[in-house]
Amino acid sequence: MAFISFPPRHPSSSARLPLTLIALDDWALSSITGVDSEKYIQGQVTADVSQMTEQQHLLAAHCDAKGKMWSTLRLFRERDGFAWIERRSVREAQLTELKKYAVFSKVVIAPDDERVLLGVAGFQARAALANVFSELPNSENQVVRDGASTLLWFEHPAERFLLVTDVATANMLTEKLHGEAELNNSQQWLALDIEAGIPVIDAANSGQFIPQATNLQALGGISFKKGCYTGQEMVARAKFRGANKRALWLLAGKASRVPEAGEDLELQMGENWRRTGAILAATQLDDGQLLVQAVMNNDLEAESVFRVRDDANTLHIVPLPYSLEE
């Protein structure tokens, strides 16, 4: 029996989110297995995976030779290698790039659509899951395994959980939470990632930005001490020569439409508007508010006013839950 996804509804902000079970159809799972898996992935991503424990997950970037990101990967260890979660729209291209040198290593790199990705967030999320699983992850142990399930813990914008599980467990959880939790699709998890300042790289923005332009250094996603990896020279230059002039920003406000990934925004300059930045992701909440995640210049004034191109409404900067100070 397959897992049936949930119908869409407008997402809520983390502050007002009732207990919600979220089908993460817009995200996709992949894995690398084999005796060379750690060495291989270490040579391809920005984070130091050799330092990762079984109880950690981290966000890393997979870059091209120029340091531009194919994708960001949410990495965690599995029994005989690693698994990662990324946006479904970039998975195929990202795996093609990752496999380019695999012929020289004892590894198997593959998409995994057998397992189901679910999010649990909102009011009393921990209590709801405690009725189902014997152990839950937390700030100390961010990854917990329970039977066929791997549970990942997220702190921001409010405590939430990502489940990598089999179809039977996904259906069982849906049944157990029936009547207690609201059901929603990927847009709700996307809204929470936007609030949390976690970069969302979809196909429209793949190959466009170095990791620092999306704040990955502030999220622990770049090691400047590890050995070489694809794109390392450009990523290091951006840090040590101050070559990066961009950052990821969170904007909120109103607009008559939800802009697409890859669109630009407009910045108010006196009585005029100037095109700026690139949108990574946007979603409209159930209260009508628009949330936008965008890469723009890193020296913007906090009071800057923006708008979706040619729109009558405006957007403003919202502080992120982490600091960009190094």
Curated annotation (Swiss-Prot):
Pfam families in alphabetical order: GCV_T, YgfZ_barrel
GO cellular component, one term: cytoplasm
Disulfide bridge positions per record: none
GO BP: any one term: iron-sulfur cluster assembly
Stored InterPro entries: GCV_T_N, GcvT/YgfZ_C, tRNA-modifying_YgfZ, YgfZ/GcvT, YgfZ/GcvT_CS, YgfZ_barrel
Domain of life: Bacteria
Gene3D superfamilies: 2.40.30.160, 3.30.70.1630, Aminomethyltransferase beta-barrel domains
GO MF annotations, alphabetized: folic acid binding
Presence of the UniProt keyword tRNA processing in the record: yes
Location (main, coarse): cytoplasm
Binding site for folate: 27, 189
Keywords (A to Z) from UniProt: Cytoplasm, Folate-binding, tRNA processing
Biological function: Folate-binding protein involved in regulating the level of ATP-DnaA and in the modification of some tRNAs. It is probably a key factor in regulatory networks that act via tRNA modification, such as initiation of chromosomal replication.
Record family assignment: Belongs to the tRNA-modifying YgfZ family.
Name of the protein in its database record: tRNA-modifying protein YgfZ
Species for this entry: Salmonella schwarzengrund (strain CVM19633)
Phylogenetic lineage: Bacteria, Pseudomonadati, Pseudomonadota, Gammaproteobacteria, Enterobacterales
